Amino acid sequence: MKDQLLKLRDEALAAIAAAADVGAIQEMRVRYLGKKSELSQVLGGLGRLPTVEERKAMGALGNEIKQAITAALDAREAELAAAALQARLASERIDVTLPGAPVRRGHLHILNQVIHRIEEIFIAMGYEVAESRQVETDWYNFEALNIPKGHPARDAQDSLFLSEEVLLRTHTSNTQIRYMLEVARGRTPVKIICPGRVFRRDFEDATHAMMFHQVEGLVIDKGITMASLKGALTEMARALFGPDVGIRLRPSYFPFTEPSAEMDISCIFCGGKGCRTCKGSGWIEIGGSGMVHPNVLRAGGYDPEEVSGWAFGYGPERVAMLMYGIEDIRHFVNNDMRFLRQF
């Protein structure tokens, strides 16, 4: 038995030394140390030896051989793994002196650029930027803004109701009411602009979308007049479209302002002489404005006998389309990088 054990040891150590990869080492672990290995079979015959001393001696020799084979396997496996790692590192070597690949820098979406520009203009004039929720209650979106039950603007064909009393806001005017009630709480002056997304039940085409943006402004104080409204709108228009642009206010109707006016700017394409864009009028419509209706002031916690205010609203999409000659509002949301990278 001793000769068998020593022969197995020598054979195993020689095979381990000649192993070419880690896979071969794993196979040898099973071959030389597994339950069905030749070594296990030889040691299984210890009980047939004639004396206790022989059984002890052969058992001790068998354990020494197991330990020697295990140590040899572990050492060779570590050696082969290290060699494989070095070979992989050599094959995947990276030249760290090469210049890095350029990374394309991101930039703000064109609408965000326009909205930020509008915010900068009004912040420089002493206004705050106020924002509010896009899912709104009927009262803040309609009732508080002098749009009672039965008004056409409440029609399900125009508004996106989520339930009987909750809808996606149709304008950012809800922010004005919430600011008056939750922030200002009767104090004056109030000078805010309210940018944000709004939603209408509309058919999408080159000039209409179900989701678009608005920027509204609100000023409340004693002695506020249409003259100061026109002054603020003139400053805004000239900051956006150039120092030579003019504005005019045309009588109109909005339920939350009285009197109400549409705001036009002199055509930036023909200088007011008349062209296809302005349809020969020399003027381009931008948005709506007017003096805050007394009912809206009351809903916001103000006494219309003590203070007055004005408000305006227009769409950043409309401004961007005029500034950059964009003809289709859908370009803003189609996520076409060929379009977006131009700005």
Curated annotation (Swiss-Prot):
PANTHER family: PHENYLALANINE--TRNA LIGASE, MITOCHONDRIAL (PTHR11538:SF41), PHENYLALANYL-TRNA SYNTHETASE (PTHR11538). Belongs to the class-II aminoacyl-tRNA synthetase family. Phe-tRNA synthetase alpha subunit type 1 subfamily. PROSITE patterns: AA_TRNA_LIGASE_II (PS50862). The keyword Nucleotide-binding applies. It is an enzyme of class 6 (ligase). It is found in: Cytoplasm. Its EC number is 6.1.1.20. Binds 2 magnesium ions per tetramer. This is Phenylalanine--tRNA ligase alpha subunit. It catalyses: tRNA(Phe) + L-phenylalanine + ATP = L-phenylalanyl-tRNA(Phe) + AMP + diphosphate + H(+). One of its GO terms (cellular component) is cytoplasm. HAMAP family: Phe_tRNA_synth_alpha1 (MF_00281). Mg(2+) binds at E258. Its cofactor is Mg(2+). Tetramer of two alpha and two beta subunits. One of its GO terms (biological process) is phenylalanyl-tRNA aminoacylation. SUPFAM superfamilies: Class II aaRS and biotin synthetases, tRNA-binding arm. GO terms for molecular function: ATP binding; catalytic activity, acting on a protein; magnesium ion binding; phenylalanine-tRNA ligase activity; transferase activity; tRNA binding.
